[in-house]
UniProtKB/Swiss-Prot annotation:
Name under which the protein is recorded: Hemin import ATP-binding protein HmuV
Annotated gene: hmuV
Gene Ontology terms for molecular function: ATP binding; ATP hydrolysis activity
Subcellular location: Cell inner membrane
Organism listed in the record: Bartonella quintana (strain Toulouse)
The keyword ATP-binding appears for this protein: yes
GO cellular component labels: plasma membrane
Membrane topology: Peripheral membrane protein
Keyword Nucleotide-binding appears in the UniProt entry: yes
Domain of life, per lineage: Bacteria
Stretches assigned to the ABC transporter domain: 2-242
Coiled-coil ranges from the UniProt annotation: none
Length: 264
């Protein structure tokens, strides 16, 4: 479980996160949504240890601030919104960066095959010897997801759930590969792991999320199931535009349809 208690992040005089409290459980896909500047990526950075915060954050009962880096790496893998590599890596070398924490939990022969298996999962089976910097933005994003998979290949290790922390994992992808990524995330959760993902696509969020958290101006505006969070009133208040919500025929999933030129 990820548990956040009274999390605050301040930059200069600006309060980015303001007393955030929530829980995300393993075996579930939790999605954070909200407008730009609402604090979504800031929360991910706090959880991954990139930025300081006040309050308490725990992952599987371990205090994020006081747990050793390698111990955290064995429990969770982070896919940041933006990734910059300083060296001219080949694709298989980038993916293999995720292997180090698995060297004591997975047999050596299986470990050697993991990068290729991970690339197959994201639809890049033949890309191993290509130069990472020559790939498109969407292809690079999928390579980074393969790295995440290498790091936490087994959703549960020694009876402890592992976590995917994904910050806008489908931002640069076409619809086919958006679905590939979201299916990987959902299957990881179904196998006992935990997934916390930041998404902007409200309809994909509605389809895949077991729990949704809507942020507005650094605070949790509401949380719960998709049908609880994705209401016309909630979305209009958070996004300041008209976002009518209906249900798809023969489905119990909300559908959000933005209206052109109807900003509030």
């Amino acid at each position: 479980m990820i548990e956040a208690v009274n999390i605050c992040v301040q930059r200069g005089k600006k309060q980015i996160l303001n007393h955030i409290d929530f829980q995300a459980k393993s075996s579930a896909l939790t999605v954070i949504i909200g407008p730009n500047g609402s604090g979504k990526s800031t929360f991910v950075k706090a959880l991954s240890g990139e930025i300081p915060y006040s309050g308490k954050m725990t992952l599987n009962g371990h205090d994020v601030t006081h747990t050793k880096t390698y111990e955290m790496a064995a429990m969770r893998a982070v896919l940041p919104q933006f990734t910059t590599l300083a060296f001219p890596f080949l694709v298989h070398e980038v993916v293999a960066l995720g292997l180090s924490v698995n060297q004591f939990t997975i047999a050596k022969k299986q470990l050697q095959n993991l990068p290729q298996k991970a690339l197959e999962c994201v639809g890049l089976a033949d890309y191993g010897n290509r130069h990472y910097h020559q790939l498109s933005g969407g292809e690079q994003a999928r390579v980074q997801l393969a790295r995440v998979l290498c790091q936490i290949w087994e959703p549960v290790c020694n009876k402890v759930p592992r976590w995917m922390i994904l910050d806008e994992p489908i931002a640069n992808l076409d619809i086919q590969h958006q679905l590939v990524v979201m299916n990987i995330a959902r299957n990881f959760a179904r196998c006992g792991g935990g997934v916390l993902a930041v998404l902007h696509d409200l309809n994909l969020a509605a389809h895949y999320a077991d729990k949704m958290i809507l942020l507005k101006q650094g605070k949790i505006y509401c949380e719960g199931s998709a049908s609880t969070v994705l209401t016309t009133q909630n979305l209009s208040d958070a996004y300041h535009c008209s976002l009518p919500v209906s249900e798809l025929p023969k489905a119990d999933t909300p559908f959000v349809l933005p209206q052109t030129a109807s900003f509030l």
